[in-house]
Amino acid sequence: MAIAKEDILAAVEGMTVLELNELVKAFEEKFGVSAAAVAVAGPAGGAAAAVEEKTEFTVVLTEAGSNKVAVIKAVRELTGLGLKEAKDVVDGAPKAVKEGVDKAAAEEAKKKLEEAGAKVEVK
């Protein structure tokens, strides 16, 4: 007589954790398998995506330098902020000046800020 799946499930459902552990070990021995989790392979194109060039950059003002007024003017010109907001950005360095811009815009902003005397990073 064959045992129905429902009967097996009902028997397993009534077992304690210790009994379930012993059952798993018995299955491993009987059928030569392992109950260890299977490592899932990543997507095949994962390596290509990692090599892909970054398209969005953030320009970070790390230090205002000695000519703070010129740096504030440069920040105002680049961001369109008011005088007080631009001063707060410069005083709060390190702070992002431009976010999510393309490489050319990031390099241009870095150049303007460095010409004004600031220290800048592009991330």
Swiss-Prot record:
The keyword Ribonucleoprotein applies. GO terms for molecular function: mRNA binding; structural constituent of ribosome. GO terms for cellular component: cytosolic large ribosomal subunit. One of its GO terms (biological process) is translation. It comes from the Bacteria. Keywords: Ribonucleoprotein, Ribosomal protein. It holds the Pfam family Ribosomal_L12. Belongs to the bacterial ribosomal protein bL12 family. Homodimer. Part of the ribosomal stalk of the 50S ribosomal subunit. Forms a multimeric L10(L12)X complex, where L10 forms an elongated spine to which 2 to 4 L12 dimers bind in a sequential fashion. Binds GTP-bound translation factors. Forms part of the ribosomal stalk which helps the ribosome interact with GTP-bound translation factors. Is thus essential for accurate translation. This is Large ribosomal subunit protein bL12. It comes from Burkholderia vietnamiensis (strain G4 / LMG 22486). The lineage of its organism: Bacteria, Pseudomonadati, Pseudomonadota, Betaproteobacteria, Burkholderiales. The gene is rplL.
